[in-house]
Amino acid sequence: MTKKVAIVGAGIVGATAAYQLSKKGIDVTVFDAGVGQATKAAAGIICPWLSQRRNKDWYQLVSHGAAYYPQLMDQLREDGVSELPYEQVGAYIFKHTEKQLAKVEEMAVERRVDAPMIGEVRALTPEDVACVIPGWSNPDGALYCSGGGRVDGELLVTLLLEQAEKNGARVAREKVTLEAVGEEVRVRLGGEVQAFDAVVLSSGAWVKELIEPLGYYVDVRPQKGQLIELTVETTEDTSKWPVCMLHGEIDILPFPDGKILVGATHENTQGFDLVPDEELLNGMYEEACASLPSLKNAKRSGVRVGTRAYTSDFLPFFGEVPSTKNAFVASGLGSSGLTSGVWIGECLARMAAGEEVGFSVEKYTPQNYVRKV
């Protein structure tokens, strides 16, 4: 029986795993250096059903993630959490032509058979959108999906770790390294090497530098992401505005009290750089203002910068580290990490606890991405 688990990396995967393991009464220690976490810089739209990505394995994963959110919120509510970080407010996806909208609508209706959480699906004119979001001026039509939601990734991770600590988990804001003793992986913090029944490696793009010293090749690369936090003075209830996925990479996420997030960039050549790029930020801001001119009067209250992890085929992986008996790993979640990450964290918690996962994980095996050299 698993009694003692280490989790290295406290983003969405690690925080979810820590929370679930702590609820099982397992001794959990979380290690996280707290630098560049992708979760804190993620836009936070939970609406995978409208994606036109053709990879069925990816869709299966994000669809499970989206369906898992209400269950996770119920657990936090039972723990006494009142300010929940996730809410189903609906989603708009914008397309240039009616033909493009019709294609997405047909796909959403087809997927709703297996994913009833999608809810109501209908095409809207720009005028329809402006009735919900006053001042909206984007000329594109939109498809509305009532099941779409938004999540504040930073708040979610904070709450999960807080609840895990209340359940007895320990959180160490420290950078650690790994050591292999035969097939067992141990954690080194300073001069001390600690042994655990299970070690969960969930450090995102940093998993490469964590595992490679043990003699592995790791197929993971970093991608820089930036988003803008804005505050708008308005009498409108922005908490009920749907999230908006514009044509291209820009999303607009309304939150309560006039808080608006705009993002995010997808920068493949910046490595682990975390310096805000004003040119890119201003470009995103101008693009958002073209759709919602009231943002021109908004106050920029912050900038979030993080590092996502990608694999060469853009599919996440999670499961046992090859040639070990107690280590589990997850990475490569990319820009949909907030959607898939909660489910991957749940699956890893079950694996680390020695339980049946109840989900077909073979297609996501780390063996395709983490290899002994």
What are these regions (language model features)?
Residues 294-373:
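C-terminal catalytic lobe of FAD-dependent flavoproteins
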Residues 45-132, 287-289:
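Dinucleotide-binding Rossmann-like beta1-alpha1 core, especially the glycine-rich loop
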Residues 171-186:
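A conserved short coil-to-beta-strand element within the FAD-binding core of flavoproteins
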Residues 82-93, 110, 117-167, 265-270, ...:
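Helix-loop-beta segment of a Rossmann-like dinucleotide-binding subdomain
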